[in-house]
């Protein structure tokens, strides 16, 4: 029971860390890109991953965690896939309207549910599907303003959805099947994610912004915000792997939409961004969907635990009489042996 409570506290801690760090990095990057004019998102992400790897390497050398070797091919392919998915999401934003980009992010949940159902035989109850539907409708109402389609943008969005879904499912599957921690997986895959983004980032950013990251004027305040962004990113990357490993890819996506609602609310209240009753209604519907999802998942988890416990007790009841009978027969045999002339 104590172990179960400790596990629940670990999950809550991971969720809180993910929300706090993600909202913080959005605020930091908004200031960096909007106010200070630094538009190189893909290159910045490669720096995030480099700093994450360096931080974890120092932690490893100081014996904060134990490294567990993972098959190199698995790590390389996993790292490259995650790096490509980040690049595709950025390209999708560049080729599509903001509204269609938001639709792309919303589509990740149903695609993840579909893939886990088809390939991992995972079951999602109708109640959980309904709560996810409410969540997606709410976030859609709150954040989607325009939907402009084009062929290249649509193809990039589909590729971004596919790579993101597969990458997040693998993040969960690798941790469970290879029995590695989120820290061990991130430590070994981060260099490959960083490498592909470091090489492709300047080209992607130049194509999207028509600016060169190497000729940008790096004032002290810009360098300060980049450093802060990289430090927060360590927590973001760590908590991402932690949440997906402890919960599921779908739960991580639900958490992502909670962050979206918090960022929107932050913009409305503190930055005085324009908002309408539609935005507020969308956020409320999304929050209701999240609460229902959390409740239904909790009920399903308790039901599964109770079923597991009852099965275990049932097995005990089945085996006890047999053991008793075996001992009794053994005792009778001993008595016969004593009186036997042989």
Swiss-Prot record:
Coiled-coil residue windows: none
Annotated signal peptide: none
Top-rank lineage group of the source organism: Eukaryota
Main location: Golgi
An example Gene Ontology CC term for this record: endoplasmic reticulum
Compartment(s): Golgi apparatus membrane; Endoplasmic reticulum membrane
Pfam family, one: TPT
Membrane topology: Multi-pass membrane protein
Matching SUPFAM superfamilies: Multidrug resistance efflux transporter EmrE (SSF103481)
Ranges that cross the membrane: 7-27, 36-56, 75-95, 100-120, 132-152, 154-174, 184-204, 221-241, 250-270, 280-300
UniProtKB keywords: Antiport, Endoplasmic reticulum, Golgi apparatus, Membrane, Sugar transport, Transmembrane, Transmembrane helix, Transport
Effect of loss of the gene: No visible phenotype. Slight reduction of xylose content in the cell wall composition.
Location of the region described as Disordered in the Swiss-Prot/TrEMBL record: 305-342
Tissue: Ubiquitous.
Example GO BP: plant-type secondary cell wall biogenesis
Residue ranges, compositional bias (Basic and acidic residues): 327-342
GO molecular function: antiporter activity; UDP-xylose transmembrane transporter activity
Job description of the protein: Nucleotide-sugar transporter that transports UDP-xylose and UMP in a strict counter-exchange mode.
Family in the record: Belongs to the TPT transporter family. TPT (TC 2.A.7.9) subfamily.
Name used for this protein in its record: UDP-xylose transporter 1
Native source organism of the sequence: Arabidopsis thaliana (Mouse-ear cress)
Organism phylogeny: Eukaryota, Viridiplantae, Streptophyta, Embryophyta, Tracheophyta
